[in-house]
Swiss-Prot record:
It comes from Malus domestica. SUPFAM superfamilies: Homeodomain-like. The keyword Nucleus applies. This is Homeobox protein knotted-1-like 2. It comes from the Eukaryota. It is found in: Nucleus. PANTHER family: HOMEOBOX PROTEIN TRANSCRIPTION FACTORS (PTHR11850). The keyword Transferase does not apply.
Length: 397
């Protein structure tokens, strides 16, 4: 929250403002004497100030409602030249300013637990201050205003802080019921406008606080899901970035009424993104397992196509080089080659067929022999460097 306040301070210095409420008669003179200076425009914003109850010109009064703790309120004196009025709320060691000024960009900051809507002034007597304070506490909008403020405090707060805020709210309501304070319809339009504007400002402030925190938590949950999906391959235990208490957003955007209507917070069960895929896979395996098994066996029986053994190829190439002019082995030669290479005759036939297609072209003499009707395999004698019969005897060159 401190980082967020620092960021908002930086933005305000750059001329950026949030939640501007302007009205000629919106709370500018509320609780002040008729002789005070009129302001042309009133803007309400929260501005961080440095600690304590604050000094400066002005008096400090203590207001206390029946059954409540004292409330410190301070007004800083201003002049008509500045047109500037500040409502300062003090609580513990921190102080925040609700400013009503002209020409200054509004900046939203965290409110304190016991915020006030009045300022002391030299022109107001103690009786008048008590009367104004009683009007604010008795205003019908005061309960909603307090609830909106506590919702802002819940945003991003740890679970123990959220619990303390809920207890404080319940104690306040109990004191209000025991004191018998009635909240009749307000007859002060100026006070109505001030309470309504302040309530709207707190609601918008809560929305601005909730949005970045919710987006950050959604992003971390997506990262958590992706990491768990990657870890499922290694059977790793589920990864949780948020603890169970943090996973409930620590009171983000939740009021006491919302928690009561929901019957308490319940942890959303984790959804395995791969459960549906695994279920489909198991169903297909059960349905087609028999067919897949038979297909696997059939494929395993088939020999993969590959090259012949190196030694066998070398012996076939040696025979090829010796019989290049007529590379047609006889049946007896095929049997001999099969025995020497360890191949069957089908493999030998296929090898010679492919080898002749790729690397052999008949000579002109062989082409004439084929054209004359002399089958080469039946030729008992072929001169010009070829073999006689089975090729064991060779004639002269």
């Amino acid at each position: 929250m401190e980082d967020y306040n620092n960021q908002m301070d930086h933005e305000s210095s750059g001329g950026r403002g949030n939640f501007l409420y302007a009205s000629p008669n919106l709370g500018g003179n509320y609780g002040r004497a008729a002789s005070d200076h009129q302001m042309g425009i009133n803007t309400f914003h929260l501005q961080s100030s440095g600690g304590g109850g604050g000094g400066g010109s002005g008096d400090q009064c203590n207001f206390q409602s029946p059954g409540t703790h004292p409330i410190n309120v301070k007004t800083e004196a201003t002049t008509s030249q500045h047109g500037h009025q500040k409502f300062q709320y003090n609580n513990n060691n921190n102080s925040h300013l609700v400013s009503s000024s002209r020409g200054h960009q509004p900046v939203i900051h965290q409110l304190q637990n016991n915020f006030d809507l009045l300022n002391d002034d030299h022109s107001l007597s103690s009786n008048e201050v008590e009367a104004i304070k009683a009007k604010i506490i008795a205003h019908p909008q005061y309960s909603n205003l307090l609830e909106a403020y506590m919702d802002c405090q819940r945003v991003g707060a740890p679970s123990d802080v959220v619990a303390r805020l809920s207890v404080a709210r319940q104690e306040f309501e109990a004191r209000q019921r025991s004191s018998g304070t009635s909240r009749e319809t307000s007859k002060d339009p100026e006070l109505d406008q001030f309470m309504e504007a302040y309530y709207d400002m707190l609601v918008k402030y809560r929305e601005e606080l909730t949005r970045p925190i919710q987006e950050a938590m959604d992003f971390m949950r997506r990262i958590e899901t992706q990491l768990n999906m990657l870890g499922n391959n290694n059977n790793a235990p589920p990864l949780r970035i948020f603890s169970p208490s943090e996973d409930k957003c620590e009171g983000i955007g939740s009021s006491e009424e919302e928690q009561e209507n929901s019957g308490g917070e319940t942890e959303v069960p984790e959804i395995d993104p791969r459960a549906e895929d695994r279920e489909l896979k198991n169903h297909l395996l059960r349905k087609y397992s028999g067919y897949l098994s038979s297909l696997k066996q059939e494929l395993s029986k088939k020999k993969k196509k590959g090259k012949l053994p190196k030694d066998a190829r070398q012996k076939l190439l040696s025979w090829w080089e010796l019989h290049y002019k007529w590379p047609y082995p006889s049946e007896s030669e095929k049997v001999a080659l099969a025995e020497s290479t360890g191949l069957d005759q089908k493999q030998i036939n296929n090898w010679f067929i492919n080898q002749r297609k790729r690397h052999w072209k008949p000579s002109e003499d062989m082409q004439f022999m084929v054209m004359d009707g002399l089958h080469p395999q039946n030729a008992a004698l072929y001169m010009d460097g070829h073999y006689i019969g089975d090729g064991h005897y060779r004639l002269g060159p």
